[in-house]
Structures are given as C-alpha cells and as structure tokens.
Amino acid sequence: MNLCAGPFDRTLERCEENEGNELLQPDLNRMNNLRRVAVIDCGTNTFNLRVVDVGASAGWIPVFGQRIPVRLGQGGVAKGVIRPDRMARGLDALVAMREALRNYRVEEVHVLATSAMRDAKNGHEFVAQAKGLAGFDIQIISGQHEARLIQEGILLNFQEPPAETCLTMDIGGGSVEFVVWDRDGIKWAQSFDTGVARLQMLMGLPDPVGQEGVAKMRPYFDDVMAPLAAAMEALKPTLLVGASGSFDTIADLVGTRIRTERPDHAQSPEPHPSIDPVPLTDWEEVARQLIECDVHHRTAMPGMDPARVDLMPFSAGLIQWVLDQGTVTRMCRAPYALREGVLSRLERGLPLLPEL
C-alpha cells in the first residue's frame, strides 16, 4: 500500500481555491469510518486520477477526478522505450496531479503503470524520476493483473451478472486486455501487445486507413491474438463489454452513452452507473467512417474525442476483428475499468493486486 508521503505532507495546508471544504472532510470521514484514497492509472495514452472516500460498507463517494493525455508511448512503444519528450510529458502530468491532490487530505495514493512502462527499457528511469519529482511510488503491473483489475471494475456496472457468456475488451495504447467470463467467474483472460498507439507505429498506415489498411492489420491480429480466437471459439461469448477510452468515444459517437457517472463532491454513496448499449448496426456505420474518412472528417464527427482522433481507426480495426470471430451478437460500453477495480478491492479490504 502506497501511503501518502514526501511532498504530500503539505496536503494539510489550506488551499485558497477550495477554502478548506475538502480539507475538513477527512475529519468527518474518520467519524464515519471512511478513508480518502487516490488511484492514478498511468496508461500508455492517458494518465487518470480518481480521489474517493471509501468505507467497508458504505461504497465510495467521488471527490475529484483528473484526466491528462500524455501519449507516453508515442514514437517509442513499438521499440520498447519512452522518448525523452514523452517522459517529460508524463512527469509533468504526475506533478500536476500532485498539485491537485494538495487540495485534499488523501490518506492513501496508489499509482499503477501499464503497458508502455512495463515494456520500456527505461521504465525504471521514469519510476525513479516520478518518486523524486512527485513523491509517488509507481507499481508497474502485469498484463494479467491489469485484465483482472479491469474485470473487477466493470462488474460494478452490472446490477446482476448476465446469464450469457461475455467478453470484456479494454483497448489501451500499448496493449489490449480481454476477459471471457460469465456469472460463475472468469473463464479466460489475457493481455496482448496490440494497443492502438503500438499499432499506429508498427503498421505505418496512411490516413485514412481505409479497408486496405484494415486488411493489412488482420493477418497480424490472426497471429498475435490466436489464443483469443481459440478462446472465443471454445467459450462462445455473445456480449462484448468494452471498457475505457476508445469505448467511451464509441458510445459518444453512436450517441448511446448515458452520462450517469457520479459527480465529484457528492455527499453520500450512490449506485454505480450501468452499462451503455452500443447497437451493432449503429457501430457498423461509425466504424465505416472511422476507417474510410480522413482525420479532418473524423474530427468533425459529433462525439469525437480530439485526443483520440488519430487512434480510433485502429480501435475500429481491433473491434471489427473481434466481431468477425462470429460469436458476439451484442455490444455495450462499461463506464468503469482498472481504477474502479482497484477502488473495489480497497473498499473490500483486499490486497491491491488479485491472485493469478
């Protein structure tokens, strides 16, 4: 457990912007058996921060959130390095998050890093500099741990586990995590180095990618993700559950995203948001535009996230390959993922990482 330390000793100071309201909250938390925790997910594309108050039986109360695009893997993820400019960008993001956390009395800070950092030859250098500059102890997690934490997060978006067999898919910049599961638990899980930033660098495709570009990706997917194809053939998942950034954008593009995420500064625990349906017929039209249209057209698409506009054609290619395996009949987007999986474990008093 990474306790708040070093530069965070100053979180007890009054912040002029917040007039101390959030600073006083932990005193109330102690009376209510709550504790304030922060989780930072250092992804290949984006660093995400969530601050919540958690309790053994009370669920969690959202306090603060921050999302900073960093493109940590840009220009280096396929070579196994973090470029100096990307390292500086990532460190700046962590320092900014440290400054944001000075507004709150955070009792625990957990910082997890995924594909770009676990594959980079100089990942240890980033970890050391993050400790010196921001006071964070970064824990680099395996792809298997990442997949299981994502799964624990998305389960919170289901009021009841579905009766059918499901396939969770989390598209990251460096890797893509898959979990086949049903109401009895996880049947199969694996992480593949087919993230969209990695694909963009490896494939060298023009803009627009076009159907020719998708055809070029398919043999690579057939080779690298052969274990997934075998698992899908054997286990026959029918519901594709998409998590994280690419699927957030897809739900916005399709227009089905239900914005029920709980606001910051809520006063009490509220129900977790539910999944958003993504009709396959609507997805097919969105996918066509992502693949066949250039960056200017994609940028103008209602719901497009500008930070992902160059990567979404590769997300579309990945999803289309999964659908082409022939078992999936429905698709949805889950609002939660890795960070919420970590929070779920903290709330239940479990070790940060699940057993494999």
Where are each of the predicted segments found?
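Cationic, low-complexity basic patches in intrinsically disordered or flexible, solvent-exposed regions
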Residues: 14, 23-26
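Helical "lid/coupling" subdomains associated with nucleotide-phosphate turnover
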Residues: 34-37, 51, 75-106, 116-165, ...
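N-terminal basic/disordered segments at the start of proteins
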Residues: 35-61
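Conserved ATP-binding subdomain of kinase catalytic cores across diverse folds
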Residues: 57-71, 75-76
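A generic, well-ordered mixed alpha/beta core segment in the N-terminal half of proteins
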Residues: 167-175, 179
